[in-house]
């Protein structure tokens, strides 16, 4: 018989830097799961991606055990890294703050494709291009 799910928690933390302090402790504390074990597993799974914000989905079961699924980095983080900027434009329609090439856009789409709801890499590229546009990043064709 399968374990009964108590709660599913989604978190986004810097890779390899999870600790029991807030926000992790605040979210996981009421569930009764061993927070330090969750932090150790997250850090072990994300240690090769230092400097990125990595989302994770933690499924907590009634017996206080858990399973963790690591996702790919958010598109906005990938775009900021490729464009060499620290944050998106406050006025994306008026001021453009960076640019990326179409090849870089394809690389991001291929990396992100397993986590996206897109039928093809080209469809994923269009979605990511829209995100770039809303951040004030231009795509050079």
From Swiss-Prot:
Pfam families xrefs: Ribosomal_L11, Ribosomal_L11_N
GO function terms (MF aspect): large ribosomal subunit rRNA binding; structural constituent of ribosome
Keywords for the protein's UniProt record, in alphabetical order: Methylation, Ribonucleoprotein, Ribosomal protein, RNA-binding, rRNA-binding
GO biological process, one term: translation
Gene Ontology cellular-component terms listed: cytosolic large ribosomal subunit
Post-translational modification: One or more lysine residues are methylated.
SUPFAM superfamilies with a match to the protein in the record: Ribosomal L11/L12e N-terminal domain (SSF54747), Ribosomal protein L11, C-terminal domain (SSF46906)
CDD domains: Ribosomal_L11
Role summary: Forms part of the ribosomal stalk which helps the ribosome interact with GTP-bound translation factors.
Family per record: Belongs to the universal ribosomal protein uL11 family.
Alphabetical list of HAMAP family matching this protein: Ribosomal_uL11
Oligomeric form and interacting partners: Part of the ribosomal stalk of the 50S ribosomal subunit. Interacts with L10 and the large rRNA to form the base of the stalk. L10 forms an elongated spine to which L12 dimers bind in a sequential fashion forming a multimeric L10(L12)X complex.
Annotated protein name in UniProt: Large ribosomal subunit protein uL11B/uL11C
Organism this protein belongs to: Bacillus cereus (strain ATCC 14579 / DSM 31 / CCUG 7414 / JCM 2152 / NBRC 15305 / NCIMB 9373 / NCTC 2599 / NRRL B-3711)
Organism lineage: Bacteria, Bacillati, Bacillota, Bacilli, Bacillales
